[in-house]
Amino acid sequence: MAATTLTHTQVVSGWAAHDSSGKIVPYTFKRRENGANDVTIKILYCGICHSDLHVAKNDWGTTVYPVVPGHEITGIVTVVGSNVTNFKIGDRVGVGCMAASCLECEFCKQSQENYCKNIQLTYNGIFWDGSITYGGYSKLHVADYRFVVHVPESLPMDRAAPLLCAGVTMFCPLKDNNLVGHPGKRIGIIGMGGLGHLGVKFGKAFGHHVTVISTSPSKQKEAKERLGADEFILSTDAHQMQAKKRSIDFILDTVSANHSLGPYLELLKVNGTLVLVGAPDKPIDFLCFPLISGKRTVKGSVIGSMEETQEMLNICAKFNILCDIETITPDKINVAFDRLAKNDVKYRFVIDMAGNPTSSP
C-alpha cells in the first residue's frame, strides 16, 4: 500500500499513557478524516489486553508516547467511504490488532496479512503517512474497511470485544492444526487466563477432550465445573506430570511468564505439537531430548487474518462462545491495570465507553 497524505482534523476524546509509569489519563487527539476506503466507528467497548499494560509501561522498549492503547474494539459504523460496499451506517463491527498491511506480498495475497512484514498496528504503530496510530481507548475510530469485521447479532458487543484479539489468537492454531471440524483429539491448554479460558471453550465446542495445565491448584474447580474441561493437571506436581506423559495430541501454551517447555513437551504423544501464543520476555528454555525422542513439534502463532477473524466470530455466534468479562468505565482503567498485573481478573476487562459498569459471568 503506497504512502498517502492524510488529513487529521477529527478531534477525539480518549485515554493515554504519557510515560513509563503506565498511568492512563484523559487525552484529546486528532484522527484522520474518513477516506474513500474507511469507515468511522463509534466505539462502544474496548477490551484490555495484557499487551496494553506492557506497551503503556514500555516493557518492550517500543512505545511512542503518548500512547492510546486498545485493539479489541467493538462499535457502530457512523460514516462509510465511497469505495466501501460491505459495510453500512449502523452496522455492528469490530477492529482487532491490525490497521493495515501492504496487500501485495505473498502473505497478504494468501489472506495471511497478519504475517505481512509491513503490517500496521492499531495502536503504537507508524501509519503509511507517518502518523502514530491510536487505539480503542477512545470514543471514535477510523479504520480501513479491509481491517474491519462484522459482529454477528447474537454476540453481545461487550463480550465480543476480546474475541478480536484473544479469541482469534486461540482459534487460529486450532484451525491451522486441523482441529476445527475434526473432533476427538486430546488437547492441552497451558494457563487459564484471558486466552486459556477461551481455549477451553473452543476445544469443547469442537468436540475435543480438553485438559487444563496450570500452576494454580485453585483453578481446578473453575476449569472443570464451570468451563467444562475434562481434566486438570497441576504442573508443579511431578507425580501428576509423570502420570500424563505421552497423553496429549496438541498443546496451546498461553503463558507469558518465563517457563521451561521441557516438562510440557513430555506430555505430548509421539508426533504431538505444542503451539506458543504467549510471549515470554526471555529466551525459552528446553532440552532437545523431549523434542527429538517424541518427534514433536514446537510452533508459534500470532493473532489471525481478517478472513479468519470473521470466521472465528461466526463460529462463536454458532456455538455461543463468549469471553468472560468484567466491564469498567474509563476512569477505572488504572485500577484494572493494577489488577491485571496481579492476574486478578476473570478473565478480561472491557472498557464501556458510554459508562454504565456491569459485570458479566
For each feature predicted by the language model, list its residue ranges.
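NAD(P)H dinucleotide-binding glycine-rich loop of Rossmann-like/cofactor-binding domains
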Residues: 102-190
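Short N-terminal strand-loop motif that marks the start
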Residues: 1-74, 139-145, 354-361
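Rossmann-fold NAD(P)-binding glycine/threonine-rich loop
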Residues: 278-295, 306-314
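C-terminal hydrophobic helical "lid"/dimerization subdomain
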Residues: 1-10, 212, 217, 306-361
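Glycine-rich beta-strand-centered segment in the early N-terminal region that forms part
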Residues: 30-46, 59-109, 150-154, 214
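Adenosine-nucleotide cofactor-binding segment
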Residues: 183-192, 200-263
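Glycine-rich Rossmann-fold phosphate-binding loop(s) that bind the pyrophosphate
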Residues: 166, 191-195, 279
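Helix-to-beta-strand junctions that scaffold the AdoMet/dcAdoMet cofactor pocket
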Residues: 268-269
